[in-house]
Amino acid sequence: MAGLRQIAFYGKGGIGKSTTSQNTLAALVDLGQKILIVGCDPKADSTRLILNAKAQDTVLHLAAKEGSVEDLEVEDVLKVGYKGIKCVESGGPEPGVGCAGRGVITSINFLEENGAYDDVDYVSYDVLGDVVCGGFAMPIRENKAQEIYIVMSGEMMALYAANNIAKGILKYAHSGGVRLGGLICNERQTDRELDLAEALAAKLNSRLIHFVPRDNIVQHAELRKMTVIQYAPESQQAAEYRALADKIHANSGQGTVPTPITMEELEDMLLDFGVMKTDEQMLAELQAKEAAAAAQ
């Protein structure tokens, strides 16, 4: 596995992490790279756009059907999609039952033991990042993923999740080789979003790898179960994903040990950028509205 790059995309649920990762990986394969995607999100939507299909059967689902994971063959769980990209979904239990992270651990061990990592240039883990619990931290903790890319936006909860993920990376950075590759901002058109993303990246001792502009063509492609790279290869949005892929490809060995900030520092930063308002500002705005209404 010499030369194998193991990267991971982390981010809060609903941030567009799976869409961003699949579009980026589709652009990477166009650079001549051989890729294996390991979906580590219980929604099992990490490979849908690459396979042009509904969510594929997961390792945990198939293992339960066959009796145990030892009863499976790699061919049972691995599907091949756009330009030869290999796809696996680890899956998770029913909501409220058991640890979804266990599926991640089971899947990665099974794939490694059965040669799925042979003959690929990249293994990409697509990981839920609202919580960095034991199972979801597994690609970091077990030194599987060496480069972590955090997908975020200018929204407060996305920034909060990004900082939390940085804490998880820091915890294992010194015992293993894991590093923060950078932040990817998926534009939500919030106030001063680019400035805020760059400021957070700097505070985390990292950099903003790419700012992905919002474009409805992403949704149009998703409705057809396709990446933008496949659906509209000549579009400006496809060019954005190619630029992101180029930056990740050139980023080998450039990752950093992150420096997460406190909740107070995060809130101060949001206040500085005018994203979060002080009680005094909110009261002044309310009084101004009431005065304007009274004057009518």
UniProtKB/Swiss-Prot annotation:
Domain of life assignment: Bacteria
Record keywords, A-Z: 4Fe-4S, ADP-ribosylation, ATP-binding, Iron, Iron-sulfur, Metal-binding, Nitrogen fixation, Nucleotide-binding, Oxidoreductase, Plasmid
Quaternary structure and partners: Homodimer.
Family the UniProt entry places it in: Belongs to the NifH/BchL/ChlL family.
Secretion signal span: none
Entry EC no(s): 1.18.6.1
Cofactor remark from the record: Binds 1 [4Fe-4S] cluster per dimer.
Chain sites annotated for binding ATP: 11-18
Entry protein name: Nitrogenase iron protein
Binding-site list for [4Fe-4S] cluster: 99, 133
EC class (word): oxidoreductase
GO biological process: nitrogen fixation
Reaction catalysed by this enzyme: N2 + 8 reduced [2Fe-2S]-[ferredoxin] + 16 ATP + 16 H2O = H2 + 8 oxidized [2Fe-2S]-[ferredoxin] + 2 NH4(+) + 16 ADP + 16 phosphate + 6 H(+)
Entries under NCBIfam families matching the protein: nifH
Pfam families referenced in this protein's UniProt entry, alphabetically: Fer4_NifH
